[in-house]
Curated annotation (Swiss-Prot):
Family classification: Belongs to the FAM90 family.
Location of the region described as Disordered in the Swiss-Prot/TrEMBL record: 1-42, 69-373, 415-437
Bias kind Basic and acidic residues: ranges: 74-89, 97-114
Compositional bias per record (Low complexity), positions renumbered to this chain: 180-197
InterPro entries the UniProt entry points to: FAM90, Znf-CCHC_6
Entry protein name: Protein FAM90A10
Gene that encodes it: FAM90A10
Top-level taxon of the source organism: Eukaryota
Length: 464
């Protein structure tokens, strides 16, 4: 019967019985695997330990309840400061403590200069400083006065003071102390307060006396001034400089001192007229066509006025339109025809009556002409109430190419109506001479040409 049994089945039963016995005998905690079962090349993904995989039953993550708590490795008394060092005795102090002790023990030596200062300001004998140095700080509280710098400092470290400054301050304070010593305490306090307030008041007073500039010019700006030749009861002359810029276009005032140093030039055949532009030469011409007018050569000469005159006058709209025509293209005065008249500038835009220039009163000065690109406009009529003077007039001439040029003369030729909406413009005296023949044109033709030119200029500026 036993021989007939299969040996394989018997072996299987034996293995099962052995495994059951091993499971029963196994301890509650995790069993440490034998060294032959551990493979250092394996790493568990759950706990991160080497020697087993995540499927292994030895992983502490699977049998967490049976995991062992890591025990302490024992106490190390060497790391714990159970016996701290005792403080060093005073008999053998260290180098740092020795220096510190010497500074605290020895009192701060007071020189005779400091004693004199203490006696001056406090009126009491100086107190003896304590060994810890606190008395010196308390006794010098009253020395902090705003009257001036003092060489006395209350810090423990004494700074280096220049001997020259120390001697000077000592003499000043000693002289001041002799005066204060004879006064009562109330007067001392009042003097100290006044001395502390003195520098501030002087500073404010000096700041108040500083003149502030009225205008600030942005870059070199040409000036244009027109001055009448009418007589006035007040006497003197009034000049209104005009400064034009690209952005603002406002009129600004020029100082009268800048024109006193200019040389005087006299012209021979010039009638007494008045214009002045800061330029050696400028061109102006008026054209009836829609195109931009070509410029005619103009040059100015100078002449002394007989006496200073003053006269307010207004500018008609036709004169303003004529003065705002195209910009000059060449500023080289040819020797042919020399005339002075209104010229325009690319920097000057259209002005409104609200932009009125300021007025400076000064005696007349004859000045040479300089190059300018400003528009010069003036009235053709004198002010009411002026007697014995010739009014200003503008003479317009027709050139060969059909253009117009203007010049100032003394004899009256025609009168244009004044309008209240025009603004004022004046300039210093400049007389002129003209070598070209004069051709008189009726005012109606002139006004028509000016209106056509101004309309064409407006259309060109709009297109640009």
């Amino acid at each position: 019967m036993m021989a007939r049994r299969d040996p394989k089945s018997w072996a299987k039963r034996l293995v099962r019985a052995q495994t059951l016995q091993k499971q029963r005998r196994a301890p509650v905690g995790p069993r440490a695997p034998p060294p032959d079962e551990e493979d250092p090349r394996l790493k568990c993904k759950n706990c991160g330990a080497f020697g087993h995989t995540a499927r292994s039953t030895t992983c502490p993550m699977k049998c967490w309840k049976a995991a062992l708590v890591p025990a302490t490795l024992g106490k190390k008394e060497g790391k714990e400061n159970l016996k701290p060092w005792k403080p060093r005795g005073e008999a053998n102090p260290g180098p740092l403590n020795k220096d510190k002790g010497e500074k605290e023990e020895r009192p701060r030596q007071q020189d005779p200069q400091r004693k004199a200062l203490l006696h001056m300001f406090s009126g009491k004998p100086p107190e003896k400083p304590l060994p810890n140095g606190k008395g010196s700080t308390e006794s010098s509280e009253h020395l902090r006065v705003a009257s001036g710098p003092m060489p006395v400092h209350t810090t423990s470290k004494r700074p280096r003071v220049d001997p020259v400054l120390a001697d000077r301050s000592a003499t000043e304070m000693s002289g001041r102390g002799s005066v204060l010593a004879s006064l009562s305490p109330l007067r001392k306090a009042s003097l100290s307060s006044s001395s502390s307030l003195g520098p501030k008041e002087r500073q404010t007073g000096a700041a108040a006396d500083i003149p502030q500039p009225a205008f600030r010019h942005q870059g070199p700006e040409p000036l244009l001034v027109v001055k009448p030749t009418h007589s006035s009861p007040e006497g003197g002359c009034r000049e209104v400089p005009q400064a034009a810029s690209k952005t603002h276009g406002l009129l600004q005032a020029a100082r009268p001192q800048a024109q006193d140093k200019r040389p005087a030039v006299t012209s021979q055949p010039c009638p007494p007229a008045a214009t002045h532009s800061l330029g050696l030469g400028s061109n102006l011409s008026f054209g009836p066509g829609a195109k931009r007018p070509a410029q005619a050569p103009i040059q100015a000469c100078l002449n002394f006025p007989k006496k200073p005159r003053l006269g307010p006058f207004q500018i008609p709209e036709s004169a303003i339109q004529g003065g705002e025509l195209g910009a000059p293209e060449n500023l080289q005065p040819p020797p042919a025809a020399t005339e002075l008249g209104p010229s325009t500038s690319p920097q000057m835009g259209r002005r409104t009556p609200a932009q009125v220039p300021s007025v400076d009163w000064q005696p007349p000065h004859s000045t040479p002409c300089l190059p300018t690109a400003q528009a010069c406009t003036m009235s053709h009529h004198p002010a009411a109430g002026h007697d014995g003077a010739q009014p200003l007039r503008v003479l317009f001439r027709r050139l060969e190419n059909g253009r117009w040029s203007s010049s100032l003369l003394a004899a009256p030729s025609f009168h244009s109506p004044e309008k209240p909406g025009a603004f004022l413009a004046q300039s210093p005296h400049v007389s002129e001479k003209s070598e070209a023949p004069c051709v008189r044109v009726p005012p109606s033709v002139l006004y028509e040409d000016l209106q056509v030119s101004s309309s064409s200029e407006d259309s060109d500026s709009d297109l640009e």
